[in-house]
Curated annotation (Swiss-Prot):
Cellular component aspect of the GO annotation: cytosol
Sequence similarity: Belongs to the IF-1 family.
Record Pfam families: eIF-1a
Gene Ontology MF, one: translation initiation factor activity
PANTHER family: TRANSLATION INITIATION FACTOR IF-1, CHLOROPLASTIC
Task performed by this protein: One of the essential components for the initiation of protein synthesis. Stabilizes the binding of IF-2 and IF-3 on the 30S subunit to which N-formylmethionyl-tRNA(fMet) subsequently binds. Helps modulate mRNA selection, yielding the 30S pre-initiation complex (PIC). Upon addition of the 50S ribosomal subunit IF-1, IF-2 and IF-3 are released leaving the mature 70S translation initiation complex.
Keyword Flavoprotein: no
UniProt domain S1-like: residue ranges: 1-72
Keyword RNA-binding: yes
Record note on quaternary structure: Component of the 30S ribosomal translation pre-initiation complex which assembles on the 30S ribosome in the order IF-2 and IF-3, IF-1 and N-formylmethionyl-tRNA(fMet); mRNA recruitment can occur at any time during PIC assembly.
Protein's name according to its UniProt entry: Translation initiation factor IF-1
Alphabetically ordered keywords of this record: Cytoplasm, Initiation factor, Protein biosynthesis, RNA-binding, rRNA-binding
């Protein structure tokens, strides 16, 4: 799978789930389940409910994503 197939959307964390998984409401209104990317996990970046995040998604499964950035 080529990296160009992925696309990024912005959203807000609305719920924290087990195993560093979060429920994120995207700016278009959809709610997806997202996990933290490896670099964020390695650098111990904490994500709390209400944080603005960027979610990287693949067109193959639009219900799951990967959190790649947390806005301050």
């Amino acid at each position: 799978m080529a990296k160009e197939d992925n696309f990024e959307l912005e959203g807000e964390v609305i719920d924290t789930l087990p195993n560093t998984t979060f429920r994120v409401k995207l700016e278009n209104g959809h709610v997806v389940t997202a996990h933290i990317s490896g670099k964020m996990r390695k650098n111990y970046i904490r994500i709390l409910t209400g944080d603005k995040v960027k979610v990287e998604m693949t067109p193959y499964d639009l219900s799951k994503g990967r959190i790649t950035y947390r806005a301050r």
